[in-house]
From Swiss-Prot:
Transmembrane segments: none annotated. PANTHER family: IMMUNOGLOBULIN LIGHT CHAIN (PTHR23267). Residues 25-35 are annotated as: Complementarity-determining-1. Residues 36-50 are annotated as: Framework-2. Residues 58-89 are annotated as: Framework-3. GO terms for biological process: adaptive immune response. It holds the Pfam family V-set. Residues 90-98 are annotated as: Complementarity-determining-3. Residues 51-57 are annotated as: Complementarity-determining-2. InterPro entries: Ig-like_dom, Ig-like_dom_sf, Ig-like_fold, Ig_sub, Ig_V-set, IgV_Light_Chain. This is Ig kappa chain V region 3374.
């Protein structure tokens, strides 16, 4: 069966300096093969985290990825205005790939 990634919430807002948490639930085991992306309007997606918790080059440690079974979490702490974007999870287990529906993060200054 195809992997389905259920991402929640669809939208979240927090103040500068705050913390947001985004969840992705995989419909089946994907081990640690999960990446997180940030996309801003008019720009291609930027990989933030791969293999569940490994930060991509240049990504600050305010971004943290974690896993509990088939549930994956992206936590963004010490929010900055520049963090306002849409975030996506992606499973890339075996030859299968599936994206979550996205979470819009609104940062209130």
């Amino acid at each position: 069966a195809d992997i389905v990634m259920t991402q929640t919430p669809a939208s979240v807002s927090a103040a500068v300096g705050g913390t947001v948490t985004i969840n992705c639930q995989a419909s089946q085991n994907i081990d640690s093969w999960l990446a997180w992306y940030q996309q801003k309007p008019g720009q291609p997606p930027k990989v933030l985290i791969y293999r569940t918790s490994t930060l991509a080059s240049g990504v600050p440690s305010r971004f943290k990825g974690s896993r509990s079974g088939t549930e994956f979490t992206l936590t963004i702490s010490d929010l900055e205005c520049a963090d306002a974007a849409t975030y996506y999870c992606q499973s890339y287990y075996s030859i299968s790939s599936a994206f979550g529906g996205g979470t819009e993060v609104v940062v209130k200054g």
